[in-house]
Amino acid sequence: MRIVTIANQKGGAGKTTTVMNLASIIAENSRVLVADVDPQKSSAWWADRAGEDLPFDVVDDTNPANLSRLRELPYDVVLVDTPGSLEGRDVLATILTESDFVILPTEPSPLAFAPLIATINEIVLPSKVTYRVMLNKIDPRVPIELG
């Protein structure tokens, strides 16, 4: 089993959208669980609206004791949707100790960089879990300067 956490302290960074899209794609060949640990329960909200047609399961739970048992569940991949703040540090700390990989979605905006860097420095690096930053909300009409 692989546990992949989608995290960024900035709200609106695209965490839930990333989780739900990845779950849909991965579910084509694997048993997928989305674990919504965000108190706003955005992934659970999406799942409720989709009804019975989702090709993956969704559970919302912020209890650290339950999160530490994710590997006992019968899934190939667990995708974890996290809160857009660092208020639930105990939940984030628990889930990162269980995670194999962290994806940090962010938009290419100066206002997005400070929360991203804070998330990496304060939460991800201390956990020693492998991570990558994923740029989203990119407008292909805007030229990118590589330097």
Predicted segment positions?
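Conserved catalytic-core segment of NTP-binding enzymes
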Residues: 28, 83-147
